[in-house]
């Protein structure tokens, strides 16, 4: 037995000794980078100043959140001495509570009239106790702060701020907070910094001024996508101050990314996109020393010119410049539309949608909704043809084609097909996707040809303006499909060609309607608003909808087909663009030259 043990141990040691060992990485030395220094003395405005009245601070616990269930956290509220309680004050939200000597800085700057009277609210991240406290609690900080979603914004707006207003100061002053986004700022350090940016990014209708120190714009929970999203998205009315140091790296997770490089990349993206952004870089590591030293100047800059509103700037993205008209924004075209999933325009550019609960398709016009056709069309998909007829999907299957005045005979095509979306070509052929996730060609003579099956939530279909390619949207996927259109109308060469951006809280794009412009770009209504694709299947621009709502239907319309209509949340929005739409029923034409790049 001893011999066996001796042999086995010896063999094991021999084998272990023969295993490869990791080479030691030489230290990364860049002689152009100054040595690390975290010595940043506080300026006078970050220290108490004689004769300046100090504000009051109180705290309370929050343990009853519905958005972050079972969490416990501390809320800290600073109320300046100048606040009288007779009218709403401006708001600053500090994430990870009130850092950077915020109360003292605000005392001094408010006294100097360098910033408005502002109530500051420090919000710590939540913890969830285990079933056997204090053992192994769940720390929600990364989930709440690093996530690229609107959860934290909703938590602040729906739960924290209302709870703060239910309190009073020790001397009985009521807490009244302004609801004007121009009166609200938010800031934080590290994970609190990306959280502050995310809140303002998701809800620019609630926060417009952002302070970001040593921001965690890395691969924690999707933050590394911000550099690209900022470049591609229609600029929002935000002002951002950024701080970081050349030696910034969080020692607890360097595998997540490079803090210093990510902050520079984020700053460059914001500058490219057209934001009002300022930065100060230093020589520090991952701490708040430099941020605390410059916090007074950052607040002065963020609040400069107040109460003049923070406005969205001209985009730097060349695609956004090409398609957007300066000064044109989303306008409500129709309200009270219930759940609209189909929008379509006729040859005059008049835009119609299915009237919920009524047997007609209705036009979007000011002061009325005239009946378009008397066929059963309540909430049914429909499209217009080059022949002037409207093609409406029937609940019993197939498509009814009738003239818009409903005087001519109705033809039934594609009987037996449970159609979810359709488009009518110039030659009268119909491409349709069914609720069974199949793609069909319905020829003008009534012949049906199944082209594909096993789609993922097929939700839209569009033909390129030259008639050579077919785009099929899949609402339950992260990709859209491209097909080559053959001379007989059938298709081949299927590829998952279109890559959508998907919110971190969703599993799919929710793509639900496609329009094409005369340059060959595709516009798709999605969970993230309208995503604009170039001809190589890449998202080149994103147009968020009001309230960051999802789009559920889309088309070009207007007299010159230069207005984009998008259905969303019971409303239909319109936005006049600098490009012209290419209706599916139009005569195909040759597109401008394009390359493989």
Residue map of PLM features:
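Non-catalytic cap/lid and distal C-terminal segments of serine-dependent acyl enzymes
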Residues: 24-312
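Beta-strand-rich domains and repeat architectures in extracellular enzymes and scaffolds
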Residues: 315-320, 327-359
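A short beta-strand motif characteristic of beta-propeller blades
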Residues: 330-335, 368-374, 407-414, 447-453, ...
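Short loop/turn segments immediately following the C-termini of beta-strands
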Residues: 356, 395, 435-436, 475, ...
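Short loop/turn segments immediately following beta-strands, especially the blade-tip
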Residues: 483-490, 577-584
């Amino acid at each position: 037995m001893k011999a066996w043990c001796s042999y086995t141990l010896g063999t094991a040691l021999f084998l272990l000794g023969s295993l490869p060992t990791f080479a030691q990485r030489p230290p990364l030395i860049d002689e152009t980078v100054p040595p690390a220094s975290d010595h940043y003395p506080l300026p006078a405005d970050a220290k108490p100043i004689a004769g300046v009245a100090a504000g009051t601070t109180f705290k309370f616990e929050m343990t009853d959140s519905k958005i972050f269930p079972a969490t416990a956290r501390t809320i800290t509220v600073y109320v300046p001495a100048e606040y009288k309680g007779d009218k709403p004050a401006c708001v600053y939200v500090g994430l990870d509570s009130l850092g950077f000597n915020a109360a003292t800085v605000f005392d001094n700057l408010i006294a100097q009239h360098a910033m408005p009277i502002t109530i500051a609210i420090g919000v710590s991240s939540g913890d969830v106790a285990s079933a056997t406290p204090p053992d192994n609690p769940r720390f929600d900080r990364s989930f709440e702060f690093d996530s690229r979603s609107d959860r934290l914004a909703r938590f602040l707006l729906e739960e924290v701020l209302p709870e703060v207003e239910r309190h009073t100061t020790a001397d009985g002053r009521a807490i009244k907070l302004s609801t004007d986004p121009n009166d609200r700022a938010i800031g934080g350090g590290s994970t609190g910094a990306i959280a502050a940016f995310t809140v303002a990014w998701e809800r620019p209708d609630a926060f417009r001024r952002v302070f970001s120190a040593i921001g965690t714009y890395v691969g924690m929970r999707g933050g590394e996508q911000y550099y690209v999203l900022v470049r591609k998205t229609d600029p929002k009315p935000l002002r951002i101050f950024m701080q970081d140091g050349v030696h910034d790296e969080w020692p607890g997770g360097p595998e997540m990314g490079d803090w210093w490089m990510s902050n520079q990349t984020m700053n460059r993206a914001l500058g490219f996109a057209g934001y009002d952004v300022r930065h100060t870089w230093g020589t520090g590591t991952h701490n708040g020393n430099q941020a605390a030293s410059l916090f007074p100047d950052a607040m002065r800059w963020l609040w400069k010119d107040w109460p003049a509103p923070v406005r969205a700037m001209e985009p730097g993205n060349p695609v956004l410049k090409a398609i957007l008209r300066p000064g044109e924004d989303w306008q409500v075209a129709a309200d009270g539309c219930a759940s609209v999933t189909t929008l379509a325009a006729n040859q005059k550019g008049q835009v119609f949608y299915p009237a919920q609960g009524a047997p007609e398709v209705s036009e979007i016009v000011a002061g009325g909704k005239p009946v378009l056709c008397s066929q059963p069309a309540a909430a049914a998909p429909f499209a217009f043809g080059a022949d002037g007829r409207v093609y409406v999907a029937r609940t019993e299957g197939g498509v009814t084609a009738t003239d818009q005045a409903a005087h001519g005979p109705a033809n039934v095509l594609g009987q037996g097909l449970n159609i979810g979306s359709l488009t009518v070509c110039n030659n009268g052929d119909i491409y349709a996707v069914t609720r069974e996730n199949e793609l069909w060609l319905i020829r003008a003579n009534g012949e049906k040809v199944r082209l594909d099956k096993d789609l993922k939530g097929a939700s839209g279909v569009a033909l390129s303006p030259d008639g050579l390619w077919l785009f099929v949207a899949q609402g339950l996927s992260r990709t859209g499909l491209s097909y080559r259109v053959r001379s007989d109308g059938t298709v081949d060469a299927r590829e998952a060609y279109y890559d959508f951006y998907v919110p971190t809280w969703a599993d799919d794009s929710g793509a639900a309607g496609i329009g094409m412009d005369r340059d060959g770009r595709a516009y798709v209504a999605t969970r993230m608003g309208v995503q604009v694709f170039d001809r190589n299947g890449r998202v080149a621009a994103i147009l968020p909808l009001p309230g960051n709502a999802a789009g559920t239907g889309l088309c070009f319309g207007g007299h010159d087909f230069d207005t984009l209509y998008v259905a969303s949340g019971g409303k239909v929005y319109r936005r006049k663009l600098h490009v012209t739409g290419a209706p599916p029923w139009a005569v195909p034409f040759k597109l401008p030259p394009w390359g493989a790049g």
